[in-house]
Amino acid sequence: MKESVQEIIQQLIHSVDLQSSKFQLAIVCTMFNPIFWNIVARMEYHKHSLTKMCGGARKGCYMLAATIFSLGIVRDMVYESALREQPTCSLITGENWTKLGVALFGLGQVLVLSSMYKLGITGTYLGDYFGILMDERVTGFPFNVSNNPMYQGSTLSFLGIALYKGKPAGLVVSAVVYFMYKIALRWEEPFTAMIYANRDKAKKNM
């Protein structure tokens, strides 16, 4: 059984063109985006860089939101373009894999879009780093089924596209997406908790 699993993994790996410049660019874009928005958000929190540049916290947040959204569009386009050049693999092609890909992509989009609807622009795009805090924690769907629906939904969407197209390279990119979001959460969750703890502490001292 172990040998068969190893053979499957080897076949999937051999179906990835690691030398493709578009594939490499897709990896770079996937890694760059969360690093970028975390660095910019930290700079905003400590130095109010975007607030000063844009003439207000809300305007600064909207600027960051537009930038992150645009970078996401570019990343998705690069991903799609990279997959077109990559070979398919018989291990993940066929009607069932296609249906699974559609289902995962659909689920991912539901999580992403419903999360954005619940949080709004400032809640989705790091408004708390600008001092734009939510009154209370959102607990309704999709947050009652997922702790981080934006990140998990995005990962599922990448995975769904990979399976729909039968491209092992897409599985690699999806794995990078997953691990980059895991790393991002290690930065974001404690920092966000600190921001709200400071807000609550300030309220008590008033």
UniProtKB/Swiss-Prot annotation:
Residues 75-101, 187-206 are cytoplasmic. One of its GO terms (biological process) is phosphatidylcholine biosynthetic process. Residues 21-41 dip into the membrane without crossing it. Its EC number is 2.1.1.17, 2.1.1.71. One of its GO terms (cellular component) is endoplasmic reticulum membrane. Present with 5890 molecules/cell in log phase SD medium. Belongs to the class VI-like SAM-binding methyltransferase superfamily. PEMT/PEM2 methyltransferase family. This is Phosphatidyl-N-methylethanolamine N-methyltransferase.
